[in-house]
């Protein structure tokens, strides 16, 4: 186990631009080893082109993470299996494969379910409810979170108010299932840290 001093030396070496090639491959690419310097996960988006063109099957994601990269934690993209969540059979197969490989499912990245900060009350409610199935799927797969977008329209303060409303309602549903709701700081005002902090307040 590294001491605090060892950790600071390694961090300083990396931060100062010293080559990290001396670090083992498992330190960089993830490992189940308790001695690894870093623990990382593989985002399914890394394979989205291969999956979309049929080169890689979504169900092979956990196997690829473990066998090709020695990574034992993964993050799913809802778009890559959105048409298969109608029943529990597919999710059960996903879970069985990940469990069999010793891979932990961490979260589901969610897009194309509507704007959680939509100015229209009905559309905003629909967007919130569209995310429920992903909270349910995340719970079933053993994830700790889903990642969402805080998309909205209008003036700065109005978007903050609308996004806060949608996220608050979705967070309430997530809390009932012990699933966190994480906002991606990507696109629109969600890239503004001050704005996003205001949404959370």
What are these regions (language model features)?
Residues 138-156, 177, 182-186:
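Active-site groove signature of glycoside hydrolases
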Residues 79-80, 111-113, 145, 152-153, ...:
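Conserved beta-strand edge residues that scaffold enzyme active sites
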Residues 73-74, 164-201:
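Acidic/histidine-rich catalytic cores of soluble enzymes
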Residues 2-140, 158-168, 175:
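N-terminal pre-domain/capping segments
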């Amino acid at each position: 186990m590294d001491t605090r001093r060892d950790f600071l030396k390694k961090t300083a070496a990396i931060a100062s631009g010293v080559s990290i090639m001396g670090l083992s491959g498992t330190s960089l690419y993830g490992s189940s080893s308790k001695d690894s310097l870093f623990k990382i996960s593989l985002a399914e988006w890394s394979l989205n082109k291969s999956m979309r063109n049929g080169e890689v099957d979504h169900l092979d994601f956990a196997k690829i993470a473990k066998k090709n990269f020695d990574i034992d934690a993964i993050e799913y993209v809802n778009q890559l299996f959105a048409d298969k969540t109608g029943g529990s059979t597919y999710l059960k197969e996903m879970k069985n494969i990940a469990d069999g490989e010793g891979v932990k499912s961490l979260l589901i990245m969610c897009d194309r379910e509507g704007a959680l900060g939509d100015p229209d009350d009905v559309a905003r409610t629909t967007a919130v409810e569209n995310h429920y199935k992903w909270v349910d799927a995340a719970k079933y797969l053993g994830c700790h979170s889903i990642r969402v977008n805080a998309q909205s329209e209008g003036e700065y303060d109005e978007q903050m108010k609308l996004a806060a409303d949608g996220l608050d309602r979705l967070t309430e549903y997530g809390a009932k299932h012990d699933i966190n709701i994480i906002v991606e700081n990507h696109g629109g005002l969600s890239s503004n840290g001050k704005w996003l902090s205001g949404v959370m307040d």
